């Protein structure tokens, strides 16, 4: 999982990517291609 300062580019990497908020952190999850997972500090 990558830690990114901006998730806008991470969301655009794949059409299944979703931005979710968990435990006060913002995550990008991607079910079909989990390699694109990312989070913001």
Swiss-Prot record:
The keyword Membrane does not apply. SUPFAM superfamilies: Ribosomal protein L36 (SSF57840). PROSITE patterns: RIBOSOMAL_L36. It holds the Pfam family Ribosomal_L36. GO terms for biological process: translation. This is Large ribosomal subunit protein bL36. HAMAP family: Ribosomal_bL36. Keywords: Ribonucleoprotein, Ribosomal protein. The keyword Transcription does not apply. Belongs to the bacterial ribosomal protein bL36 family. One of its GO terms (molecular function) is structural constituent of ribosome. One of its GO terms (cellular component) is ribonucleoprotein complex. The gene is rpmJ.
């Amino acid at each position: 999982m990558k830690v990114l300062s901006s998730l806008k580019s991470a969301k655009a990497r794949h059409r299944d990517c979703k931005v979710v908020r968990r435990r006060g952190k913002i995550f990008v999850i991607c079910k079909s291609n989990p390699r694109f997972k990312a989070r913001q500090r």
